[in-house]
Amino acid sequence: MYLLRANLEILSVKMCDGKFSEQTIAKMEQIVQRMATIEQLEQFDEVIENDNQFHACIIEECGLKRLYTLWSSMDSGNTIVFYRGAGKNEYVVHNQEKIHRRVLDAVKTGDVQVICKTLIDHYMETTIGYLKDHGISTEEFPYKINVNF
């Protein structure tokens, strides 16, 4: 489900041709700033909430309510990905702002290719880390995000 969410976000970026409103960018900026204030592992639920709100901005930009409904129906899968990363929770807490700043900076370019590539990298970083933690070769992993821009 995690990589399906990534593909839905990429679809939204393509549908809006990489053009995000000033309001959406401002909202994403506020979320990233909120991410920077989280310092304690006890705030892990806020980390997940911020992540969902940030990525929801990407999905909502194209204006298709059904796309958002489909994407948000996978929230539980995203939550599981966060909690399955046990042992890396502190890393996520302390790096969430930096990780999402890259995506926001890409969004600000308005360039579909840059945004989509950054989203792929964003989602694959987590996926590759999970595979390595479980002794699975990335070459054996059958699900790749191969997106033509």
Task: Annotate the PLM regions.
Residues 1-4, 50, 118:
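Generic alpha-helical secondary-structure signal
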Residues 5, 21-24, 28, 93-96:
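Generic alpha-helical segment signature
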Residues 11-36:
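Amphipathic alpha-helical dimerization/coiled-coil segments
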Residues 25, 29, 48, 68, ...:
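Conserved positions within tetratricopeptide repeat
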